[in-house]
Amino acid sequence: MEGLEDMTELKYKITYTSKFKSQLKKLKKQGKDLKKVKNIIEKLAKGEKLNYSYKDHKLIDNNYFHNYRECHVEPDWLLVYQINKDKLIIYFIETGSHSEILFR
């Protein structure tokens, strides 16, 4: 996402997977408001805790997303990410609907 990587007040360096980038392009074509996900990315990269409404939680009992977190941008729009606190990097892994991400 343009502009976020250059912000000096970020606690974590932002890294996007190629899959995440392609999923964002798809969501943009679908008319989704990418400002919503950009705001979440900014909060997470600053080390801020997300509001309860985002339902941020660790993914458990999932072999594919071991040690990852997920939050809700909208009721059926998820953001999967991982924070490496030792290296101060936040990885944005995937974004999309429940069926696209969790039920493969």
Model-based region annotation:
Residues 1-10, 22, 29-35, 71-78, ...:
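Enriched for short, Lys/Arg-rich terminal
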Residues 45-72:
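A short, surface-exposed loop/turn module that caps and links secondary-structure elements
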Residues 19, 64, 97:
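Residues that form or immediately flank small-molecule/cofactor binding pockets and catalytic motifs
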Residues 39, 60, 103-104:
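Short, intrinsically disordered/low-complexity patches at protein termini
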Residues 16-43, 47-51:
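N-terminal first-folded block
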